Regions:
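Cleavable N-terminal signal peptides
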Residues: 6-7, 17
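C-terminal lobe and pocket-closing loops
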Residues: 114, 200-268, 297-300
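Hinge/capping helix and adjacent helix->loop/strand transition within the periplasmic-binding protein
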Residues: 73-79, 93-180, 229, 242-275
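N-terminal signal peptide c-region/cleavage motif recognized by signal peptidases
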Residues: 12-18
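Beta->alpha turn/N-cap motifs
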Residues: 83-88, 148, 178, 195-200, ...
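An extracytoplasmic/periplasmic, membrane-proximal ligand-sensing/linker region
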Residues: 164-165, 205, 231, 253-314
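A ligand-binding cleft/hinge motif common to bilobed small-molecule-binding domains
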Residues: 87-97, 161-165, 192-226
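N-terminal (or domain-start) structured segment
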Residues: 18-105, 143, 167-194, 203, ...
Length: 314
């Protein structure tokens, strides 16, 4: 691709006007998870097509607020983007006052993926189905530990749904991230985890973890043999976390539209989409307008659940 053509196709990233400064995709989480994986696929696609550097910058902390605020307060010049999970927009605003307003200070670009979550237990726990787990939890109220990567995290909300629908009481142990929690899960120090399939697949396949149910409305392409929560007897249980691409508020609509189209083209390429699906990442894209409506609706839905459950910030 010639430089002129690359500039025309990837004008959204403004790679040509500022070739000396790499564009960046900020991920408000540590490397290795689904958001980081998607950001790197996107960055590689943009860089390969344009010939200009695109870097992924991991800025974890503050329940994903630190990296998200960084982007919210960046110049609206089309050089800085945020690839973030749903809780930044749907959950965090209901848990306390942040130094920025994600719904006002960040502009939706496109939905990028749904992340397949799975309910797992360590192989040392003598349950082989969601029904058996519920029965065990009922016989030992408050004795089974579940982990999460923090108050209001998808893992926390997933376990709360399990408690409410299963009619059980579990003991919550929040961690600073998923990695230390999964390490304790493998060691049997916590007994229940509802988390992203891609980070759990190796442990499920080598028999260290047992998958009891997936949390979306349909079975996982990566774990087709595992029933959905509804199929496993947890009727009404559905947790379908998403990831999206955002820009600082004030970025030109034309730039946002072009970036959304570029991201959709890269992530929906058959090879990339299949590789991500094998990791439990279901690529889904949208227009900026569709995504903006979706974000507002999801914020309202989780706000009701959080208020009803009485969840408070740490």
């Amino acid at each position: 691709m010639t430089r002129l053509l690359a500039c025309a196709v990837f004008a959204a990233f403004q790679l040509c006007a500022h070739a000396q400064a790499p564009a960046r995709i900020v991920v408000p989480l540590t490397p290795g998870g689904s958001p980081d994986t998607l950001a790197r696929v996107l960055a590689q696609g943009l860089q390969a097509a344009s010939g200009q550097p695109v870097v992924v910058e991991n800025r974890p902390g503050g329940n994903q607020n630190i990296g998200s605020e960084l982007v919210a307060k960046s110049a609206p010049d089309g050089r800085t983007w945020l690839l973030a999970p749903d809780n930044v927009f749907a959950v965090n605003p209901h848990l306390g006052k942040a130094a920025f307003d994600p719904l006002a200070d960040l502009a939706p670009v496109t939905l990028v993926a749904r992340i397949e979550f799975v309910l797992v237990v360590p192989q040392s726990l003598s349950v082989r189905s969601a029904g058996e787990l519920v029965a065990l939890a009922k016989s030992k109220p408050g004795e089974l530990n579940y982990g999460s990567s923090g108050i209001g995290s998808p893992q926390h909300l997933g376990a709360l749904l399990l408690e409410r629908i299963g009619g059980v009481k579990l003991n919550h142990i929040p961690y600073k991230g998923a990695a230390p929690a999964v390490a304790d899960l493998l060691g049997g120090r916590i007994q229940v985890w509802v988390g992203a399939a891609n980070s759990l697949l190796p442990h499920i396949r080598d028999g260290k973890l047992r998958a009891l149910a997936t949390t979306a409305g349909k079975r996982s392409g990566a774990l087709p043999e595992v029933p959905t929560a509804a199929e496993a007897g947890l009727r009404g249980y559905e947790l379908d976390p998403w990831l999206g691409l955002f820009a600082p508020a004030g970025v030109a609509a034309e730039t946002i539209n072009r970036m959304g189209a570029d991201a959709a083209r890269i992530l929906n390429a058959p090879q990339a989409k299949a590789r991500l699906a094998a990791q439990g990442i279901d690529v889904q894209t949208s227009t900026p307008q569709e995504f903006a409506r979706f974000v507002r609706d999801d914020n309202a839905r989780w706000g009701e659940i959080i208020r009803s459950a009485g969840i408070k910030a740490e």
